[in-house]
Amino acid sequence: MSVEKKRQSWHWFLLVGLEKRIFATGLDNIKPIANICQVENGIFIPNMEDSSFLEQNFIYHIMQVLVKHIDTLRKYTPFIPQFISHEHIDASCRKSDYAIIDLLNKSENKSEEMIEILEYVHDKCIGKSDEETQLHLKMRVFGGDVLTNERAYSAQLALHNGTSELDRLQCVIHRPEGLHRIMNHLLFIYQQFYKVTSAGEPGTLSHLRNTVGRVDVHGPDEVIQKYRSHYAFVEDCLDAFIVGAYMHLSGTQNLQTESPLQQTMFNFLSDEQKYTFIHKLAKDILDKYVKTDIHNIRRKTDALDTQSSQLKDMYCSEKMKYVCPICNKLYKAKGGMKRHLNKEHGFSFELGDENSTTEKDHIATYRASFMTCALLLRDTNDAYKMGDGNRITVNAKFQMLLARVGKHTKYQLWLFRYLAYIKCLLTPQMAYEYMWNCSANLQGGLGRNIPNDNLVEILVQTVKKKVYCQGANASYASVRKAALTTQIQEEIKENLQSQCDKKKSGSKRPKANKTSDILEMVSELNAAQMFDSIPGREFRSFSGFEDLFTRINVSELHSWITENRERLSYEVLN
């Protein structure tokens, strides 16, 4: 630093191109899947099939924990699938092709510069036909965190009155990418289940953190800055809760003793019988200690969809009023018609809430809710590792509901838009490719995918190293040149290493052995009777803790989805 060149804050935009690995050329690519104004709100809410699908994935993760930490169950390891398979497993194992397209001297924080970024994308990255004004139907996905999505979306809205797709910058579609989705879900977990004031209450996350001395875990305030340590702690806590649940279910005092839940004549049983046993054990743990009721949300949403459809049928377009089907009385507003039907004809528009009069065990609810959220976090992370677009999409429905509970309004909105693109706004071909190309594989191989925004973060860190190497001589021009030659330099390095028969440096971090920490947490959980059912008890710091999904006001959620469906119908031009 000198008098002429003081410390500066540079805001540049790194544009990375990633080639799709999964295609759906056999699907229709002419018109959108559905008119978003005509679909029911229920398609954005998890249904019975989604819940069952998620539960099967949870059972898989529980089985993996059991055979990993419990000595007497390790013999079942060969009979459990190594991974959750999907129809594009071979394509997800292929190494991804990507390139740094450019480093733009633009800041996404400024509206006019965000417009210029999108103009650059349309100019350089969108294929044109012979006539310059005509664009191919193929569009590009513009991914990033929700702030990047929001700014790009707002830039498009600013030019909504343009005469062509090019003028409106409509040839990019937006996608909230995985790393920031996982980060937001992890932040939600800490906001709901971690309080420093609960450190003296055995069984809470804060108490477990102090028990095993995780000094790098500080709660929701530092989740983003210290993501890796906070993520690892939640993973370890989940393992401890699952192991503790197994001990409570089997009635064992320690993990070395034989459990009464054993198969006799193990060596004479078929592989299917062995798998059935460990699967049932995991399912029993899920049903007794984890499972929460989400079906009530779907039931109420379907009821509201039916009411909305009935009221829509009462509207007369000629009279521009609602007509009562019983007495033919006219009303201008939907609210007036609902009040009339309720008062004069006994129609009920209230959703019956099932209020239990029995006293609840709020500590058991805390346990079940935490295990549900932590399993959802693990399954979403695993889905991105495996490049499983279907799992990523199903989990987005549950994450959207939890984002509403946590008042993460931007993530709720963008998860809804993500689902809307897949369910309605895109053509079948575009929706399929949009859903399945959410990850990149830098090395090639099974389970080595990372979210697309994680790839960008890695490349950003690489470019920052170039900036630091240049020191006071760094400028936009020099850093841009370094960024555009980074991949070429890496290829030259790899070729030289190959010719010299030099071993490549490892691309994996060594795994720390956390068994002792997990066993210590299990002891604390058992001592706190976390797996018992004792009505009336609660944590002082989490007074009256309720199941997360029961906190959702379904009527308000239904209205919110309806409002945003209508908004997308005119903001996104098809």
Across the structure, where does each feature detected by a protein language model lie?
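Buried hydrophobic core signal strongest for RNase H-like alpha/beta domains in large
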Residues: M1-N574
